[in-house]
């Protein structure tokens, strides 16, 4: 048994199988032009019983034991063909075998081919019964896929399952190019397992040996196999030189893992990144455990911390059992608040402001469902560590539709709130919400009348510290009962646009809603989970101004809006525009003195919102939205983008995004107090582009400029060269990475990345643009 020791050489070889699976069709077709195809009718099933056909210029022999054929000898059986200048056929009876053993020796210009491989050499041998074949001092070429090489001895075994090379070489480069190759004392290519095993392997770039390994495995197909993946290297101002060496472990058909040693020069250690994926009867999930044993930079910056170990744990699970039980996990936790500032990770970002740890178990049958959950938050702030967790929370829904003309629902919730600080208020909240609806509709409109009762009880504890520092004191026990009444009407009109655009249809969809909720003073209730909701067009018609249940604003308002859509003759939506407003007859209030606009007594048209989408053509698209809130005295949020998209590799997008500081403060008050970079709001204009710039060259770029700070926000540039046997990618990224409180300016991280993949081993010929777009700090979002 030969010892199997994977090394860095394997990482350079195994790249193609696990690289991105986008397909550049033109490059793939170009590469396949240099690969031979099987052009004879394919014979299925067992070919051993098929007759052997021999053509030659001359033949002589001692029938039936021996025969010699000379001059353009051509032997065929099933899918196999052997050609040579001279062939000696031997046939002998084997004890216990019903058929004689037939072998051939071939001399001069030996050519063997089947639907899998072509072998060429000066001398050959074959067993016509088993299809075992030997060719000496020759070369080989795979059929229908890239892969070729040379060997002292080439053997076909196991009904053409195995190709075995003695002192052989392998490359996926097309004939005439030996950019890279692998040479080994023995190479075994297993077509069923789609793998090549190589002993005493030397990896060469051109004629120069670069790496050596006593043993390695090389994937030669798209089948899942354990092995090293694409190695990666980059340089960042945060961690200096970084190198990734991922290893894929195919544990079982329903589970696998990726183990990545991640070396960071500045940190002085290796972070072990372990990703585990599974599929079971209870559902599917993914776990990630990243662990850095020690961090010399963190130790220097935080001398008072007992440990410099850095770690991340992430778990996402979703599953259904017995059609009624539901299990969900969304859990992210890190060792310290600075983790996402120091390390890039797809499971979190410093701009999120917090990480969530949520577990839930649900039960659902017809007309009823219940969920028990726990939810905690880890705030990424060393100044403000206060956060509330729900430990536990019970949500119950009961539905009963078609009760006469009515639909009914009862929603209930019980939750216990706990704070990370010992001196902050805590509470148990019980909420009950019965609802009755009267829905009426026809083919051109609908009206829904709804009435509900909002009944909530609070039992609050640990109030001494808060009450001693605030004029408005919290109550240990508080009840809030609020009826709610709503009427929501919609109509849909449509017309043919034969005069302007034959085959096109335009709709006009007016909508009006009246909402009434009486005022209840909620100043004696602490705000545990409520925040202002975004008021885009669809948000204008919400029942609530705030998310959560701690703040339910009074309402005596009418919301009106209109949407118009245009469909082409294939029923594809080409254009839509929506405009709406909320008109307040009385001020919307909660009694919370911390909500500044409740002191303004503003009524009338306070909130406006609009959204639009225009698919100008199959390649051009425009999308935008704006929300104006007079309570904030300005535009709250807006966004717009225009995009040209020819295909997945050719696109250009211009976009703008805006959020006022007042809006950020109202929606994220705790995060706003510590996120200095957003004190002036967000006003950024950006561009994203991806394009093949020359033959086999592609480029991706993104640039965002902060118009408030008059400086660059984030940028990225990536260039990739793709050929039939390798691809090289170089990328640069500059991104916002926190705020320096001492120097009062933003902190940026600069990163330069580089990687190589070997092509032709799998079906991937992608130009790399989609992967580079997704890896950007501000990921590309499709407008079309």
Curated annotation (Swiss-Prot):
Signal peptide start and end residues: 1-24
Gene Ontology annotations for the cellular component aspect, listed alphabetically: cell outer membrane; transporter complex
Disulfide bond annotation, renumbered to this chain: 31-724, 173-725
Subcellular localization(s) per the UniProt record: Cell outer membrane
NCBIfam families per UniProt: PRK03761.1 (NF002997)
Function summary: Together with LptE, is involved in the assembly of lipopolysaccharide (LPS) at the surface of the outer membrane.
Record-stated family: Belongs to the LptD family.
Name of the protein in question: LPS-assembly protein LptD
Organism: Escherichia coli O6:K15:H31 (strain 536 / UPEC)
Lineage of source species: Bacteria, Pseudomonadati, Pseudomonadota, Gammaproteobacteria, Enterobacterales
């Amino acid at each position: 048994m030969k010892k199997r020791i994977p090394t860095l050489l394997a990482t350079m070889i195994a790249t193609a199988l696990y690289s991105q699976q986008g397909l550049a069709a033109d490059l793939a077709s170009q590469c396949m032009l240099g690969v031979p195809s099987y052009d004879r009718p394919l014979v299925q099933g067992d070919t051993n019983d098929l007759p052997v056909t021999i053509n030659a210029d001359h033949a002589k022999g001692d029938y039936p034991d021996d025969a010699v054929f000379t001059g353009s000898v051509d032997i065929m059986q099933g899918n196999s063909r052997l050609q040579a200048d001279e062939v000696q056929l031997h046939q002998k009876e084997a004890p216990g075998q019903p058929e004689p053993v037939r072998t051939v020796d071939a001399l001069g210009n030996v050519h063997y081919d089947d639907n899998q491989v072509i072998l060429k050499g000066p001398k050959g041998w074959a067993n016509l019964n088993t299809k075992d074949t030997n060719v000496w001092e020759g070369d080989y070429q795979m059929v229908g896929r890239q892969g070729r090489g040379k060997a002292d001895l080439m053997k076909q075994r196991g009904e053409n399952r195995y190709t075995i090379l003695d002192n052989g070489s392998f490359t996926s480069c097309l004939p005439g190019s030996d950019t890279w190759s692998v040479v080994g004392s023995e190479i075994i290519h297993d077509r069923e397992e789609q793998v090549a095993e190589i002993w005493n392997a030397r990896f060469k770039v051109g004629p120069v040996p670069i790496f050596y390994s006593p043993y390695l495995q090389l994937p030669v197909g798209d089948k899942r196999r354990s092995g090293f993946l694409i190695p990666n290297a980059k340089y960042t101002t945060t961690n200096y030189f970084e190198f990734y060496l991922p290893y894929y472990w195919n544990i079982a058909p329903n589970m696998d893992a990726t183990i990545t040693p991640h070396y960071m020069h500045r940190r002085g250690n290796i972070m072990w990144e372990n990703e585990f994926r599974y599929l079971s009867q209870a559902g599917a999930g993914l776990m990630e455990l990243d662990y850095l044993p020690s961090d010399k930079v963190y130790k220097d910056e935080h001398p008072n911390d007992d440990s410099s170990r850095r770690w991340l744990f992430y778990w996402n699970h979703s599953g259904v059992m017995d059609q009624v039980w539901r299990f969900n996990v969304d859990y992210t936790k890190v060792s310290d608040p600075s983790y996402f500032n120091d390390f890039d990770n797809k499971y979190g970002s410093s701009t999120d402001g917090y990480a969530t740890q949520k577990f839930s178990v649900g039960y659902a049958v017809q007309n009823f469902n219940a969920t028990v959950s726990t939810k905690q938050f880890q705030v990424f702030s060393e100044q403000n560590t206060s956060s509330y967790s729900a430990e536990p929370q019970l949500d119950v829904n009961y539905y009963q539709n078609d009760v006469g003309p009515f639909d009914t629902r009862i929603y209930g919730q019980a939750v216990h709130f706990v704070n990370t600080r010992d001196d902050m208020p805590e509470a148990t909240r019980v909420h009950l919400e019965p609802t009755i609806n009267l829905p009426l509709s026809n083919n051109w409109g609908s009206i829904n009348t709804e009435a509900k009762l909002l009944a909530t009880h609070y039992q609050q504890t640990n109030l001494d510290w808060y009450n001693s520092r605030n004029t408005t004191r919290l109550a240990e026990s508080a009840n809030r009962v609020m009826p709610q009444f709503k009427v929501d009407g919609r109509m849909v009109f449509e017309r043919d646009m034969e005069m302007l655009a034959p085959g096109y249809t335009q709709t006009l969809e007016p909508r009006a809603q009246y909402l009434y909720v009486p005022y209840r003073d909620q100043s004696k209730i602490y705000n545990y989970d409520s925040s202002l909701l975004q008021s885009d067009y669809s948000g204008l018609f919400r029942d609530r101004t705030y998310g959560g249940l701690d703040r339910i604003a009074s309402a005596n308002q009418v919301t009106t809006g209109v949407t118009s859509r245009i469909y082409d003759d294939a029923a594809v939506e080409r254009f839509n525009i929506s405009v709406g407003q909320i008109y307040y007859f009385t001020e919307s209030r909660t009694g919370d003195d911390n909500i500044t606009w409740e002191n303004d007594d503003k009524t009338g048209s306070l909130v406006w919102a609009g959204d639009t989408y225009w698919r100008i053509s199959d390649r051009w698209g425009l999308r935008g939205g704006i929300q104006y809130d007079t309570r904030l005295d300005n535009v709250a949020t807006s966004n717009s983008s225009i995009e040209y998209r020819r295909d997945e590799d050719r696109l250009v997008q211009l976009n703008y995004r805006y959020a006022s500081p007042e809006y950020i403060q109202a929606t994220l008050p705790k995060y706003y107090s510590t996120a200095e970079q957003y004190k002036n709001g967000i006003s950024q204009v950006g561009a994203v582009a991806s394009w093949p710039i020359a033959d086999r060259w592609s480029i991706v770029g993104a640039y965002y400029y902060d118009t408030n700070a008059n400086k660059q926000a984030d940028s990225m540039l990536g260039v990739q060269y793709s050929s039939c046997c390798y691809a090289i990618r170089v990328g640069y990224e500059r991104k916002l990475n926190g705020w320096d409180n001492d120097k009062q300016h933003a902190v940026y991280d600069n990163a330069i990345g580089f990687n190589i993949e070997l092509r032709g081993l799998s079906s991937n010929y992608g130009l790399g643009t989609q992967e580079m777009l997704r890896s950007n700090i501000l990921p590309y979002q499709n407008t079309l």
